[in-house]
Amino acid sequence: MPKLKTKSGTKKRFKLTASGKVKRGQTGKRHGMIKRTNKQIRNKRGTTIMADADAARVIKNFMPYA
């Protein structure tokens, strides 16, 4: 059986932490920012840790050797 490939979009969007959690960028910053408050925009900076159920799905389906 051939080796499974990691999805290239997944390896660009997600990183695994040392403890095995999945880190991702914040969502909701592509357009429509004019109607957001400055606090909302500021809080969307940086990265966040995914929920365990979502992270498990990402790892199982898209990053087979992670």
Swiss-Prot record:
Keyword ATP-binding: no
Alphabetized UniProt keyword annotations: Ribonucleoprotein, Ribosomal protein
Gene Ontology MF term list: structural constituent of ribosome
GO biological process, one term: translation
Taxonomic source organism: Parvibaculum lavamentivorans (strain DS-1 / DSM 13023 / NCIMB 13966)
Pfam families per record: Ribosomal_L35p
Similarity-based family: Belongs to the bacterial ribosomal protein bL35 family.
Gene3D superfamilies attached to this UniProt entry: 4.10.410.60
Cellular component GO terms held in the UniProt record: cytosolic large ribosomal subunit
InterPro entries the record matches: Ribosomal_bL35, Ribosomal_bL35-like, Ribosomal_bL35_sf
Xref: HAMAP family: Ribosomal_bL35
KW Ribonucleoprotein (keyword) present: yes
Name this protein carries in UniProt: Large ribosomal subunit protein bL35
